[in-house]
Amino acid sequence: MRVGMGYDVHKLVKDRKLIMGGVEIPYELGLLGHSDADVLLHAIMDALLGAAALGDIGKHFPDTDDRYKGISSIKLLEEVGKKIDEANYIIENIDATIIAQKPKMRPYIDDMRKNIADALKIDVDRVNVKATTEEGLGFTGSGEGISSQAICSLNSVSNYIYGAADMTNCRSDCGGCMGCQNK
């Protein structure tokens, strides 16, 4: 089993959409960044890449590359999911926290979880997202920005018992792991 941790933060500014977990959230401010600045997905991607010892999102999607300017972080998460598959890991779980004073995230969390699970081709019950405030303290508490933290666990395909696995939803040519039975 491998564990990864990710963290991201972006500044809130006018004239930008607020995208969190692939969901557009109605708000007068949005996050400033090279891509759509989805801090939740950026933290999750860094956690996944870290757990697999594949670097970080800056290595794979540098902000100096115009191909990623304004790109949806859901597309980047899909690419990270492919890299995790290619490295022969299975995502066991993801647990993430959004830290924002405003707006309230609770109404959008189920959609965020679904978007993350769909992008990674995993069951939604392997993804948890929660939100908290900093009680008015710090840059998130004062409304200057939003941050996110994520942790994930991966398991190597070779750690699963091979045998008569249900290959119906298999995403790789690994030879059949029991992990696919849960899809």
UniProtKB/Swiss-Prot annotation:
Co-factor note (free text): Binds 1 divalent metal cation per subunit.
Coiled-coil residue windows: none
Cofactor field: a divalent metal cation
Binding site for 4-CDP-2-C-methyl-D-erythritol 2-phosphate: 8-10, 34-35, 56-58, 61-65, 132-135, 139
Pfam family, one: YgbB
Sorted UniProt keywords: Isoprene biosynthesis, Lyase, Metal-binding
Gene Ontology biological process: isopentenyl diphosphate biosynthetic process, methylerythritol 4-phosphate pathway; terpenoid biosynthetic process
Catalysed reactions, semicolon-separated: 4-CDP-2-C-methyl-D-erythritol 2-phosphate = 2-C-methyl-D-erythritol 2,4-cyclic diphosphate + CMP
Feature type site, description Transition state stabilizer: 34, 133
Domain of life: Bacteria
Record-stated family: Belongs to the IspF family.
Record's function text: Involved in the biosynthesis of isopentenyl diphosphate (IPP) and dimethylallyl diphosphate (DMAPP), two major building blocks of isoprenoid compounds. Catalyzes the conversion of 4-diphosphocytidyl-2-C-methyl-D-erythritol 2-phosphate (CDP-ME2P) to 2-C-methyl-D-erythritol 2,4-cyclodiphosphate (ME-CPP) with a corresponding release of cytidine 5-monophosphate (CMP).
Protein name: 2-C-methyl-D-erythritol 2,4-cyclodiphosphate synthase
Species whose genome carries this gene: Lachnospira eligens (strain ATCC 27750 / DSM 3376 / VPI C15-48 / C15-B4) (Eubacterium eligens)
Record gene name: ispF
